[in-house]
Amino acid sequence: MARHCELTGKKANNAFSISHSHRRTKRLQHANLQWKRIWWEEGKRWVKLRLSTKAIKTLEKKGLASMAKEAGINLNQY
């Protein structure tokens, strides 16, 4: 499974690790992803999604149905 948020699409960012001598090597800054079980009111069941912590905070404000509609996700597949 790809390491990205299923609602917002957040994924890893390319960055550099910089040593004391200022040598730079490429690395990835991964999104803070969590498995979250959310109650889907319209479907009357639990839905398990891999979400970024920012998406979890936004869910509390907007709700699951509206965020899934914005992302173009069919919740029946989860």
Swiss-Prot record:
Disulfide bonds: none
Gene3D superfamilies in UniProt: Ribosomal protein L28/L24 (2.30.170.40)
Biological process per Gene Ontology, one example term: translation
Keywords: Ribonucleoprotein, Ribosomal protein
Gene Ontology molecular-function annotations: structural constituent of ribosome
This protein's record includes keyword Ribosomal protein: yes
Listed InterPro entries: Ribosomal_bL28, Ribosomal_bL28/bL31-like_sf, Ribosomal_bL28_bact-type, Ribosomal_bL28_sf
Residues making up the signal peptide according to the UniProt record: none
A family per Pfam: Ribosomal_L28
Highest rank taxon of the organism: Bacteria
GO cellular component: ribonucleoprotein complex; ribosome
Homology family: Belongs to the bacterial ribosomal protein bL28 family.
HAMAP family the record matches: Ribosomal_bL28
Protein name, UniProt field: Large ribosomal subunit protein bL28
